[in-house]
Amino acid sequence: MEYTTLAVLAGLPEDPHGAVGLPIYAVAAYGFKTLEEGQERFATGEGYVYARQKDPTAKALEERLKALEGALEAVVLASGQAATFAALLALLRPGDEVVAAKGLFGQTIGLFGQVLSLMGVTVRYVDPEPEAVREALSAKTRAVFVETVANPALLVPDLEALATLAEEAGVALVVDNTFGAAGALCRPLAWGAHVVVESLTKWASGHGSVLGGAVLSRETELWRNYPQFLQPDLKGQIPWEALRARCFPERVRTLGLSLCGMALSPFNAYLLFQGLETVALRVARMSETARFLAERLQGHPKVKALRYPGLPEDPAHRNARKYLASGGPILTLDLGDLERASRFLGAIRLLKAANLGDARTLLVHPWTTTHSRLKEEARLQAGVTPGLVRVSVGLEDPLDLLALFEEALEAV
């Protein structure tokens, strides 16, 4: 089936009352009729026990995401940040190393530097080019971490080449597919990535109303290289032998949900399940508008530089054509310096907010917001300059948006 068909049909459970929509299971715990039934649920993990671990509403969302991303398994969590943390918790142990792309989302860099460091994990930042990654690999490397589209540098890595390299090295390629819009724009697992993490807060939600995140993984024998999957668990089982490729998502569920409690609300799961039904339509419209704006603002005398992967002359265009369904709904304008960016943002009659994927166009100044906690050198390495403005294009009329941008540029 095609993506748009799966988006409305996949994951919808049969309902004893014949409901044609997804019910919200707003309960904390699930009862047992007998001692033996409770014992079996705890022993096997089948069925429902406590909503922190799993619930039917979240399960339906996981099934839909699996279909849309082409995944073996999916685990949904409270936010995209929770998803990234849970995936890395499942992969890493003290003394391990991660090779990460320069130019990641600011909070991901913060997670690496302020949390993973407490676990004794070292992160090496390199350009997300295969040779640079190869040179950074060591015997301690357990993961390579990149974004589908760098936020906000808008560079697109060669996912297939990186996946081949990671497979040869016996380490996991983890891709933050937030900019891939739940598979509507990109499906990294199809290109060989072992793990996908993503924020569902963005395009999956579509209205900036809920938080959510997901970890997805594919069929692979890679987990045989990780000691945590070859040692007995609390049930006395060897995870790899008992679960094969599902040992990784099960560890994500155990660590991220059961033990760390980063559970997704069933209300949020319901809204995200619903949002996925229209994500492909919204992303296609937003991408068309983003290209329209990029083509008309490119070369504007008040714009020092414009980045949009859908433009043929953009540095990311070659990889974008291969990996993305379109140029995407994000573009950036560099207005030259902080003062010019401030005047532009003060004049434009659109929302200024540190979010993406909303039905409304959102603008943000990464230098003073999303990347402000990084040192200046790190910001510049991430492609963030004092004059840069990131634009997440919404569903407004393209001509109206162009008029608003041109009006604001007159104030620069």
Swiss-Prot record:
Cofactor(s), names only, from the UniProt record: pyridoxal 5'-phosphate
GO molecular function: cysteine synthase activity; O-acetylhomoserine sulfhydrylase activity; pyridoxal phosphate binding
Catalyzed reaction equations: O-acetyl-L-homoserine + hydrogen sulfide = L-homocysteine + acetate
Record PTM N6-(pyridoxal phosphate)lysine, positions in chain: K202
Pfam family, one: Cys_Met_Meta_PP
Ways its activity is controlled: Inhibited by the carbonyl reagents hydroxylamine and phenylhydrazine. Also inhibited by methionine and propargylglycine.
GO cellular component, one term: cytoplasm
InterPro entries attached to this UniProt entry: Cys/Met-Metab_PyrdxlP-dep_enz, OAc-hSer/O-AcSer_sulfhydrylase, PyrdxlP-dep_Trfase, PyrdxlP-dep_Trfase_major, PyrdxlP-dep_Trfase_small
Thermoactivity: Optimum temperature is 70 degrees Celsius. Stable at high temperature. 80% of the activity is retained after treatment at 90 degrees Celsius for 60 minutes.
Superkingdom classification of source: Bacteria
Entries under Gene3D superfamilies matching the protein: Aspartate Aminotransferase, domain 1 (3.90.1150.10), Type I PLP-dependent aspartate aminotransferase-like (Major domain) (3.40.640.10)
Alphabetical UniProt keywords: Amino-acid biosynthesis, Methionine biosynthesis, Pyridoxal phosphate, Transferase
E.C. no: 2.5.1.-
Catalytic EC class: transferase
pH dependence: Optimum pH is 7.5.
GO BP: cysteine biosynthetic process from serine; L-homocysteine biosynthetic process; transsulfuration
Cited function: Catalyzes the conversion of O-acetyl-L-homoserine (OAH) into homocysteine in the methionine biosynthesis pathway. Has weak activity with O-acetyl-L-serine, O-phospho-L-serine, L-serine, O-succinyl-L-homoserine and L-homoserine. Shows a very low CTT gamma-synthase activity.
Record text on subunit structure and interactions: Homotetramer.
Homology family: Belongs to the trans-sulfuration enzymes family.
Protein name: O-acetyl-L-homoserine sulfhydrylase 2
